[in-house]
Amino acid sequence: LHLERTKVTVDRRGYIETNEFLETNAEGIYALGDCNGKAPFRHKANYEADILSHNLYLRTEENDWRFAEYDLVPAVTYTYPQVGHVGMTKEQAEAAGYTVSVGLHHYSQTSKGYSLGMMEGKVDDGFIKVIVEKKSGKILGAHVIGEQASILFQPFLNLMNAGKHLLRAIHPEIGSEQTKVLRAKKYVRNLEPNVISTINETMVPHPALSEVAMWT
């Protein structure tokens, strides 16, 4: 990239430092995807590209800004069986101070799983585990091992992403004048659960058939 010819700074690993609006420390230069070191997934790059295109070209209202958050980046391992997850594990949630409830359900305990020949105790009997804050019922994490895992945890990801999002500074030292204004006013973006834009602003793991529904 010949960054030495610019004023763009990198971290100790060599990744370009970006803030929540994908800005670098050089005015007018943005960075997204693997080069900023924030989760090396195609769907994370898609998410960042959507944010940039919205803010730079598609925004129609003055107070309509999108910003990046990285605590709900889904991941899928396309092995047999598939493994998919988003959010916290039970151990991570408890370490963060949450009192949690854990729900676990096997494929074989459903009619569809049984009709597919999945039986309790067999190696192909997948399961989904959901981590919830006990008091509020807030979903903290969803984890699936089994057939089509990449699809099965998408509804939880959608629900986890819905609601009010308070702007949180990433690299506070990086920021345009507009970014500083939004930080100072504690900008909030509200993603209603029954509005199509909320689906559009939720990550979907790539490649997964859930992209068919999420990109409609």
PLM segments and residue spans:
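Flexible, glycine-rich terminal cap/loop adjacent to redox cofactors
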Residues: 79-89, 94-216
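A residue-level signal for beta-strand positions that form part of recognition/binding surfaces
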Residues: 15, 74, 99
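Short amphipathic alpha-helical segments
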Residues: 28, 73-74, 140
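Small-molecule pocket liners
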Residues: 6, 74-75, 128
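Solvent-exposed alpha-helices and their adjacent loops that cap or buttress functional pockets
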Residues: 23-24, 69-70, 120-124
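Short beta-strand-initiation
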Residues: 11-13, 72, 125-127
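A conserved FAD-binding loop/helix module that cradles the flavin
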Residues: 32-94, 151, 205-216
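FAD-site-proximal beta/loop scaffold in flavoenzymes
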Residues: 1-62, 155-158, 169-172, 183-190
